[in-house]
Amino acid sequence: MSSDSSISIRVSDELRVLDTKLREAGLARSRGPAARQSNRTPRFAPASPEELDRLRPESAEPAIASNGVQWLAASGWKRLGWLWHGFSTRRGGLSRAYRQDGAQGELNLGFTSEDDRDTVIANRRRLAEAITGCADTPLVTVRQIHSKLVVRAGRQAAAAKPARADGLMTDEPGILLAVMTADCIPVLVVDRKCKAVAAFHAGWRGTVQRIVESGIGRMQLEFGSRPEDLTAAIGPGIGTCCYSVGDEVLAEFESQFEYGRGLFVEVDETDPVRRRYPTMFLNQRAPGHGPKETRLHVNLVEANRRQLLAAGLQPRSIRIVPGCTGCRADLFFSHRASGGRAGRMMSVIGIGPER
């Protein structure tokens, strides 16, 4: 008997022993990608694109400032006479780098490689004027890194190099805190009693790291904030309808949140003709390989609402400003909808004079 044959026999014997032990433990050895695919059971009941429409949020109508800037506000927050806040749209600026057909100048607020820096500065002044009535209101930003880092800011931070973080908080009047988005979820928080405010940028990575929940914890330490005195607004971002992700994102959420799996749906993304007449397309597949017909979609708005609840806020204290950036490319900038070439919106909040 050759040495190769004896090695093959020993390996086969060892594998049989391993299979026996795994069966006794209620497990099974992987047989490779093909076997895993053939035995795969759906993790979710697949939703068709038509069924996903019910998850598509209606966009709120923006307010139009006297300088032409269009922006969105959280319902009920106007009652807080000292509060400045707003969620910008792409409308009402001077930028031409991302201008759609027939559109006027747009309100890009990020220093992107495609836009002129002076134009962006002018756009930021226009937004400050629309929100506060004064274009010179200091604007504090951060260098966003998809983290859970939150910094406390004062007036001097407006002139300093932006800190590496994804959240800002202050109890100092006269400045605007700002986070930038083009699909990620902006969250603004107000302490009505202590007159403190915060802004958070929550992409999926920041959401998994609990930036909103930990940021509210920082407000409690810095300002003595109590959950019952807080109110929050979740601004426009990419909706479940448009936000497809990979299995690794599902794994991250499942590892961090007991409700993580419930944030996902599996969407059938094949076109209606292919779904109705699948045999017509068989010759387009390689033997043994089916098409990737479903994709996971995640609800980041609900994920951050859950974090606000976990931080102690009551459901009635949470406002959701509707609008999917992926669906409404006419109203919002969207990194995904534009193939990666997009401007940036700002969500701003600050403490102004009592009105």
Question: Language-model segments: what does each one mean?
Answer:
Residues 2-355:
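Active-site microenvironment for binding and transforming phosphate-containing groups
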